[in-house]
């Protein structure tokens, strides 16, 4: 979470710098969507699903101006992608945890970010919705890069393209694999990977100072 806040500019780094690159060239910033770990929305606040998703475009709207037709259309497209069309006019206080998660994800992608940052996105989503949630992320990943923080390694293992381990120091493993032994070290207990079909097998280089 701290690393994500540094990337987002919410916290200054103690040392080092954050650089953004686009097509191999350093750029001053990128369009970033963010889904925080904890849901800070007051569910008693009288706001609808559509209004929450629309709020993700607030930075694009000039002060005292209405949203354009194209922006409103974009909101409707996101509602469709999230499967929220039938809930668009419903107050957020009436939603389940999985439904609210989809609303917040919709808000984070409606601005069409170049990078989507998710902090423990399945922390308050029930298991029945989790599979569908990751299918949504796979679809979003076709248009946006995704940085996902999760302690649930088993869930994301088959989906991620690169792994970064953070324990005081950041260890980055591009295109790497994870072994059962590595998982066992991180969970402090023996781990056995079980799955149907092609099982992802990943082996990471040993971290220094471990």
Q: For each predicted feature, which ranges?
A:
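Conserved ABC ATPase "signature" region
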Residues: 54, 68-87
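Conserved ABC ATPase signature
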Residues: 91-95, 99
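Helix-to-loop junction immediately C-terminal to a conserved catalytic motif
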Residues: 8
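Conserved ABC transporter NBD signature motif
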Residues: 16-32
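Catalytic Walker B motif of ABC-type/P-loop ATPase nucleotide-binding domains
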Residues: 116-120
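ABC ATPase nucleotide-binding domains
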Residues: 177-210
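Conserved catalytic loops of ABC-family nucleotide-binding domains
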Residues: 136-148, 152
């Amino acid at each position: 979470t701290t690393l994500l806040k540094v990337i987002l500019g919410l916290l200054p780094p103690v040392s080092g710098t954050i650089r953004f690159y686009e097509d191999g060239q350093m750029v001053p910033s990128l369009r970033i969507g963010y889904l925080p770990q904890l849901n800070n929305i007051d569910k008693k606040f009288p706001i609808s699903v559509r209004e929450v998703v629309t709020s993700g475009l607030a930075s694009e709207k000039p002060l005292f101006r209405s949203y354009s037709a194209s922006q409103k259309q974009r909101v409707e497209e996101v509602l469709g992608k999230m499967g929220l069309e039938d809930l668009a006019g419903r107050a957020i206080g009436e939603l389940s945890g999985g439904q609210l998660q989809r609303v917040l994800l919709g808000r984070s992608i409606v601005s069409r970010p170049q990078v989507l940052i998710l902090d423990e996105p399945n922390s308050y989503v029930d298991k029945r919705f989790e599979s569908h949630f990751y299918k949504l992320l796979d679809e979003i990943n076709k248009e946006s890069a995704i940085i996902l923080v999760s302690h649930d390694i088993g869930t994301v293992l088959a989906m991620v393209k690169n792994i970064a381990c953070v324990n005081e120091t950041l260890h980055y493993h591009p295109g790497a694999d994870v072994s059962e032994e590595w998982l066992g070290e991180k969970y402090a207990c023996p781990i056995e990977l079980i799955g149907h079909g092609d099982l992802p097998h990943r082996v990471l280089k040993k971290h220094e100072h471990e």
